[in-house]
Amino acid sequence: MAQADFIHDGAVIDYTPGADVTAGDVVVQGDLVGVAKLDIAANAPGSLAVEGVFDFAKEAGGGVTFAVGDLAYWDDTNNVAVTTDGGGANKLLGKVVLAAADGDATVRVKLTP
């Protein structure tokens, strides 16, 4: 028996939520962060993107800025991208690919698989 069998490239993963998920929702499972590209009904199979480039909500006007190449983290409590891991409470999204100023409402991030 093989030690591993190839399943697929891994840009998306299977996901069956316990509650409805709306397209664009960020889903955190342990240290894995994915984005729903389509609506997923509760208890129905769907998928989450775990690779790709997305615009994530960020605090606007709170002094939060991002430079290209910065690490971005997801604050699942406040549903925004942040600059720190919050002592492990915030999960790594990936690297910033478009700078975001303090007044910007979003930051563009390449997900880290």
Predicted stretch roles:
Residues M1-P113:
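Surface-exposed, low-hydrophobicity beta-strand/loop segments enriched in small/polar/acidic residues
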